Amino acid sequence: MWNSSDANFSCYHESVLGYRYFAVIWGVAVAVTGTVGNVLTLLALAIRPKLRTRFNLLIANLTLADLLYCTLLQPFSVDTYLHLHWRTGAVFCRIFGLLLFTSNSVSILTLCLIALGRYLLIAHPKLFPQVFSAKGIVLALVGSWVVGVTSFAPLWNVFVLVPVVCTCSFDRMRGRPYTTILMGIYFVLGLSSVGVFYCLIHRQVKRAARALDQYGLHQASIRSHQVAGTQEAMPGHFQELDSGVASRGPSEGISSEPVSAATTQTLEGDSSEAGGQGIRKAAQQIAERSLPEVHRKPRETAGARRATDAPSEFGKVTRMCFAVFLCFALSYIPFLLLNILDARGRAPRVVHMVAANLTWLNSCINPVLYAAMNRQFRHAYGSILKRGPQSFRRFH
């Protein structure tokens, strides 16, 4: 069943005559949604000042990889399913296969970079600007495409139409063992690395939450002693205290506005000193101080409330990052498992097609996540759709 169709480029099979129409409808929806959503994302990154961060260039890179697939490659996939025949020749079949796997590899590499950046921002904020400097970001962006192309270019002669999935891909038998190694590196090692980084992020968030919980208890104890007897003000003391917590709110700490994909991070205020470690230290320092002025209690309470809200900000980021990663992984896991468990191609052809078509989701889902979980992206999308060209003048 996995034999390539290099002679007539046909993927005709009686068992998929009905399913192909569903695949065509699904493919058109993915192409339209992905193209519109990813174009809106690029425009939002270009015109929204708070989204113009160095780190968000990774989001742009992920968006370009998705746009390559949705806009350029997906229409040919739809046409092939509609006619059950590849109609653009052998050379473009090879080009299609190379671009397809380049897009996938760039997406995985970018997701790894985003996860690494998010982890450094939380756990090692002083290291973040060194790794993700302007030069480092450019090298990472260019490197992801160079690595993607060069890793799959050696398969040029084995890119053919694979009838079981009705797509130009590499011939599984002729490409071994190189293809097995590549798939292991990108989809097993790559996705596992992303998962590990997000587990580490979750652990850092929990540590910060525990530290701020301790700070809250200490704060309550201090206020009780304050009400009992301390009435004398200490000039300038609250200003120092407020600058330690209140000013390190979401814009300077871990932003609740995600990236990318994903995603993950938008970094509305891209501060290199942000992170769970920084906020945790601030909470611990403030917990050691006293609050002597009763008449300034409302301001102090507001500052403390912003400090104790930090874990929820961390939680939003973690949930967003996990959602982007989860959507990407879930779109590929059925296809990967099916290829491992059904190496001899005994499963019905329609099962292979359904699993392959599910992978299309990862190229169009990220803009939906950005709109649903990111206020800045949501506002930028809305402004572009409502105002059109006027939105460009508005954000300059």
Swiss-Prot record:
Q: Which residues are exposed on the Extracellular face of the membrane?
A: 1-21, 79-94, 157-180, 342-352
Record flagged with keyword Thylakoid:
no
User: Which pairs of Cys residues are joined through disulfide bonds in the record?
Assistant: none
Chain intervals with Basic and acidic residues compositional bias: 290-308
Q: Which residue intervals are annotated with compositional bias (Polar residues) in the record?
A: 253-269
> Which residues does the record list as Phosphoserine (modified residue)?
S221, S224
The record describes its quaternary structure and partners as: Interacts with ARRB2 and ARR3.
The name this protein carries in UniProt is G-protein coupled receptor 84
Q: Which gene encodes it?
A: Gpr84
